[in-house]
């Protein structure tokens, strides 16, 4: 196991910078998830750690050793890809053992490592099968086993669950979490799926257009997003964003005055999550929501609508008492769960 350091890491293609000075430290045994939309630079960043992409500027260290100029095989890392990358003519056992054979480990050591990893990943009954005889989830477990037997300093996982169906993704998510709890190997996991990110990570790195917008625990990112981008990306449905103006001792939002201190004369954005809106009392300041669509999900329902000024709003309600389309509701935000952002920079106040 080893700590991993990224120090002002940059990447350019044809003079155009696509990764903009990323800095973070990963502790020994920590599981860090890099999450963001397509094209944000998360896989490029992972490939630079792996040595599959050259670094334009900055420094990457694994276990205290700068690896900028080292080949991938010299970095003591193991990668798991979304397409499994198994040898079709080899059995599960042979696929898992292949890297160890190349490294010229003894036959006894190879057998012991393969057996231990197969037990951990529940592959014991599949060792003599070939990839074509396996399900997608089983193939991904073999790919993980092939990485695990190497006892690397770090695991790098690039969207390993994206080819699986929803049920298998849940099963594999739980298995990866249990595996990390057992082996405690330093890991970097890349995904665009916020559920994977929130449930697996010790810490998240939220990427946007080559910039690490926020690096924090899942709870901190959900409860205190640093920017409007993070607030809108993490959480489903996304956080409601309402244009607002500071009045000093209050906030003007959609024609209503809320008792929320805010810098006078400043254009702001009020963020409120769908679960932090409630039906307003007769004397309580609130917004009239014209419901246009309702998504019923069983335990919960999400009412989508617009305020009088056209601002879109989503409200979460109990599934047993959902609102109906074309309803008009007076709703108010929970005062203890509001988020204020600067309208120009998008940064949290």
UniProtKB/Swiss-Prot annotation:
The complex is composed of two ATP-binding proteins (UgpC), two transmembrane proteins (UgpA and UgpE) and a solute-binding protein (UgpB). It catalyses: sn-glycerol 3-phosphate(out) + ATP + H2O = sn-glycerol 3-phosphate(in) + ADP + phosphate + H(+). One of its GO terms (molecular function) is ABC-type glycerol-3-phosphate transporter activity. Residues 4-234 form the ABC transporter domain. Its EC number is 7.6.2.10. It is an enzyme of class 7 (translocase). It is a peripheral membrane protein. One of its GO terms (biological process) is carbohydrate transport. Its main location: membrane. Part of the ABC transporter complex UgpBAEC involved in sn-glycerol-3-phosphate (G3P) import. Responsible for energy coupling to the transport system. GO terms for cellular component: ATP-binding cassette (ABC) transporter complex, substrate-binding subunit-containing. Belongs to the ABC transporter superfamily. sn-glycerol-3-phosphate importer (TC 3.A.1.1.3) family. The keyword Translocase applies. Pfam families: ABC_tran, TOBE_2. It is found in: Cell inner membrane. This is sn-glycerol-3-phosphate import ATP-binding protein UgpC. The lineage of its organism: Bacteria, Pseudomonadati, Pseudomonadota, Alphaproteobacteria, Rhodobacterales. SMART domains: AAA. CDD domains: ABC_MalK_N (cd03301). It comes from Cereibacter sphaeroides (strain ATCC 17023 / DSM 158 / JCM 6121 / CCUG 31486 / LMG 2827 / NBRC 12203 / NCIMB 8253 / ATH 2.4.1.) (Rhodobacter sphaeroides). PROSITE patterns: ABC_TRANSPORTER_1 (PS00211), ABC_TRANSPORTER_2 (PS50893), UGPC (PS51315). Keywords: ATP-binding, Cell inner membrane, Cell membrane, Membrane, Nucleotide-binding, Sugar transport, Translocase, Transport.
């Amino acid at each position: 196991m080893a700590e991993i350091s990224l120090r002002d890491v940059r990447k350019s293609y044809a003079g155009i910078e696509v990764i903009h000075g990323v800095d973070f430290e990963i502790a020994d045994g920590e599981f860090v998830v890099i999450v963001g939309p397509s094209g944000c630079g998360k896989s490029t960043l992972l490939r630079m750690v792996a040595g599959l992409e050259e670094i334009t500027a900055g420094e990457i260290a694994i276990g205290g050793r700068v690896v900028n100029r080292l080949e991938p095989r010299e970095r003591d890392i193991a990668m798991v890809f979304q397409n499994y990358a198994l040898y079709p003519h080899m059995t599960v056992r042979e696929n898992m053992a292949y890297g160890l054979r190349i490294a010229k480990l003894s036959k006894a050591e190879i057998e012991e490592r393969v057996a231990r990893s197969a037990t951990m990943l529940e592959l014991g009954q599949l060792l003599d099968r070939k990839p074509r005889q396996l399900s997608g989830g089983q193939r991904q477990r073999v790919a993980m086993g092939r990485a695990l037997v190497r006892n690397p300093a770090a695991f790098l996982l690039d969207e390993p669950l994206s080819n699986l169906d929803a049920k298998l993704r849940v099963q594999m998510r739980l298995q990866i979490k249990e595996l990390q709890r057992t082996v405690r190997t330093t890991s970097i996991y890349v995904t665009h799926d916020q559920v994977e990110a929130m449930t697996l990570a010790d810490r998240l790195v939220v990427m946007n257009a080559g910039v690490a917008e926020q690096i924090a625990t899942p709870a901190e990112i959900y409860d205190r997003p640093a920017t409007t981008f993070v607030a809108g990306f993490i959480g489903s449905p996304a956080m409601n964003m309402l244009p607002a103006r500071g009045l000093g001792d209050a906030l003007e939002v959609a024609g209503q005055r809320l008792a929320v201190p805010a810098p006078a004369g400043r254009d702001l954005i009020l963020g409120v999550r769908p679960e932090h809106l409630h039906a307003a009392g007769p004397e309580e300041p609130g917004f009239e929501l014209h419901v246009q669509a309702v998504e019923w999900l069983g335990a919960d329902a999400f009412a989508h609508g617009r305020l009088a000024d056209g601002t879109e709003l989503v409200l979460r309600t109990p599934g047993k008492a959902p609102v109906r389309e074309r309803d008009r509701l007076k709703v108010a935000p929970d005062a203890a769960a509001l988020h204020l952002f600067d309208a120009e920079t998008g940064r949290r106040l």
